[in-house]
Amino acid sequence: MAQVAIFKEIFDQVRKDLNCELFYSELKRHNVSHYIYYLATDNIHIVLENDNTVLIKGLKKVVNVKFSRNTHLIETSYDRLKSREITFQQYRENLAKAGVFRWITNIHEHKRYYYTFDNSLLFTESIQNTTQIFPR
């Protein structure tokens, strides 16, 4: 249970202050290999380097993920979130409209992979030198 509280705090903090450098540093310090974020439920599945897992259950309302695919909406929504024109909840809803069911962020590869309901890869982005917003 202590790990869940630690990771929840890390994810909450990055949403608040957008300090992604600190976010990645903390994830690496806690031996996170990658995490999977499920847009529909707001759940986060964290996979550690030793293959142990931690689940953070989402507290937000469930959103409906569309079957349409819109990579442009993914990019523009991110830009609007970064400039604080929209909230994380609105960002999440926009990604669901764009057809994103889940994303996987690989900490060591510095990549985020967006997937649809049928597990098709929809979009890939580098997270190395960018300011990103992360779930929770």
Swiss-Prot record:
It comes from the Bacteria. Pfam families: DUF1398. Encoded by the cryptic lambdoid prophage DLP12. To E.coli YcgX and YdfO. This is Uncharacterized protein YbcV. It comes from Escherichia coli (strain K12). The lineage of its organism: Bacteria, Pseudomonadati, Pseudomonadota, Gammaproteobacteria, Enterobacterales.
